[in-house]
Amino acid sequence: MANGRTHTKIAGTADYDDPAFWDTKFATGQDVGEWLNPGENIVQAALSDLENRSFGPERSPRVLHLGPGISKLGTKLREAFVDRDWKGSGIVNVDFSSEAIRLGQEIESEQDPSHAMHWLRADLRAWNDMSSLAPFAPFDIILDKSTSDAIATSPSAPFSPTSISHDTCPVLRDIVDTQGEITVSPVELLALHLVPLTTEGTMWIALSYSTMRFDNLPRLAKYWDIVSRTSLKAPQGQVSSFAHTPEVFHWLYTLRRK
């Protein structure tokens, strides 16, 4: 993966899709760490699903945390794993910021190896990077706290039979083989990249500011069902105190792998 932007920036958007942007924010302490809210709802949704499955000493849950940055969400989940005698090492944090990975690995180096989370650098839009997660797959849960929102600021990607290579996701390769030249939105591309890393029943739990983050994406819908979409009132610090300001809501999505 390149260290900086590899495509044209969409006018009017922040550099959310540029790893160098995040490296600077994390290294200089400019990022607050928790986007939208601290993520307790995501943790509870993940635990509720996992507790309805069968796990034991030989098979702890496997969780893929997308774009954690410096969030404490993974740490909260790991603590819940330890309380349930699940191995925290089943949690894999993946981010395209080298600084986020460095900070995460530094913290985990102090943990017991069986409970130390993995931190891996990868661009979620690049299958050459995502395929490196295969040794940890299949994942039972995907955690996504506004990462899809950030990815959505990227431009759509064109694919054609002549552009397909061994670095192309096999799911995407099959689509191009059938349909020919296509253009894939960034969130749809992420959804397709997650397919080979998951199995039927895998849950993708995503917190977003958008009321329609996963809507009208037919290629996503082929592999993922939107099971629920729950409104969550935004924390007070993110809304104006002016009396007539409307309430602001975030959205907790649950998608199930078909």
Name what the model sees in each region.
Residues 160-200:
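A short glycine-rich, Lys/Arg-flanked "PGG" loop and its adjoining helix->strand segment in the class I
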Residues 200-221:
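Conserved Class I SAM-dependent methyltransferase catalytic core
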Residues 144-148, 153:
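A short beta-strand submotif of the Rossmann-like class I SAM-dependent methyltransferase core
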Residues 1-41, 45:
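N-terminal, positively charged/glycine-rich alpha-helical extensions of SAM-dependent methyltransferases
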Residues 129-142:
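A short acidic, Gly/Pro-enriched loop at the edge of an enzyme's catalytic core
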Residues 62-127:
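Class I SAM-dependent methyltransferase SAM/SAH-binding core
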Residues 34-60, 76, 80:
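Conserved alpha-helix/loop element of class I SAM-dependent methyltransferases that forms part
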Residues 215-258:
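Class I S-adenosyl-L-methionine
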